[in-house]
């Protein structure tokens, strides 16, 4: 009888220890802060305010939880908007298991039959910096994006630092040179699409489309159901490509990690 009581207590304490460990993983030590309002890049005339968490050692479990609740990650910084009087940023995710390829997407795959792909931990080389700055200079001329050359330190802090065991870069190589870099997180329930840049001299390859289609392929290989696309703002040209990858779900708001996120089926036509 005493042994039975001992084992009951042992099991209870084991469960409590596991629950506490789960809570610790979902609430890591962080430095929390907000930025002062600045001009919105998505809606002219609006102001942006971001809520940030700086976490030096975020677990995959934590990142999975917050990405599914509308947060984004750059380096060791996690963030989501808390804009005054505006809630236009909606989170999107692709339903991988039911994904449907369009004719134009199949053409993009065929056009990249000779494009070499490497998946590895994020890295920093002169080729990365050159390509990143070339792409943003092109977008400045074409779409009036704000632009200044990124330094190696800035690139490292944004795209290499904080990758831990889940961050990856997908390198696209053609003619023996780097022509595209896709930064992603491979999480417990999906792939979080962080940032993509490419060589505008290879615009005919539709690398932006192809990179997302490769994420679909990668997610299927890992048996992951979702690809998290980040934010969509109605009428914003920079996000116009996102609804083309169907089917999708949309999330309104940024629920706490203790709350279940309410994702619903969505298309831009609905």
Predicted segment positions?
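Short, positively charged and aromatic/hydrophobic N-terminal segments
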Residues: 5-18
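Acyl-donor-binding surface of acyltransferase catalytic domains
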Residues: 16-17, 36, 40-43, 50-125
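Helix-boundary/low-complexity linker signature
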Residues: 22-37
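Short secondary-structure junctions
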Residues: 29-32, 72-76, 248-252
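A residue-level signal for conserved active-site and pocket-lining positions in enzyme catalytic cores
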Residues: 66, 132, 242
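A conserved beta-strand-loop-helix scaffold within acyl/acetyltransferase catalytic domains
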Residues: 77-84, 98-204
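Active-site/acyl-donor-binding loops of N-acyltransferases
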Residues: 80-81, 90-97, 226-270
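Aromatic (often tryptophan-rich) hydrophobic motifs at membrane interfaces
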Residues: 170-251
């Amino acid at each position: 009888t005493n042994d039975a009581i001992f084992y009951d207590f042992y099991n209870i304490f084991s469960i409590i220890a596991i629950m506490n460990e789960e809570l610790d993983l979902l609430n890591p030590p962080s430095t929390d802060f907000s930025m002062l309002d600045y001009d919105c890049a998505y809606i002219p005339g609006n102001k942006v305010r971001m809520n940030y968490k700086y976490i030096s050692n975020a677990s995959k479990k934590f990142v999975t939880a917050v990405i599914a609740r509308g947060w984004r990650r750059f380096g060791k910084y996690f963030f989501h908007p808390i804009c005054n009087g505006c809630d236009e940023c909606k989170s999107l995710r692709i339903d991988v298991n039911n994904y449907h390829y369009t004719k134009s997407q199949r053409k993009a795959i065929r056009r990249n039959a000779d494009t070499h792909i490497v998946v590895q931990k994020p890295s920093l080389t002169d080729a990365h910096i050159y390509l990143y700055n070339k792409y943003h200079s092109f977008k400045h001329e074409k779409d009036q994006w704000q632009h200044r050359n990124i330094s190696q330190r800035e690139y490292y802090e944004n795209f290499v630092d904080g990758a831990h065991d889940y961050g990856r870069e997908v390198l696209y190589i053609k003619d023996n040179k780097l022509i595209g870099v896709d930064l992603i997180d491979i999480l417990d329930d999906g792939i979080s699409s962080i940032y993509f840049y490419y060589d505008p001299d290879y615009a005919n390859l539709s690398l932006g489309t192809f990179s997302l289609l490769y994420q679909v392929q990668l997610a299927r290989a890992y048996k992951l159901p979702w690809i998290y696309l980040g934010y969509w703002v109605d009428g914003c040209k920079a996000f116009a490509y996102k609804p083309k990858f169907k089917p999708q779900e949309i999330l309104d708001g940024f629920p706490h990690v203790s709350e279940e996120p309410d994702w619903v089926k969505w298309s831009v036509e609905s």
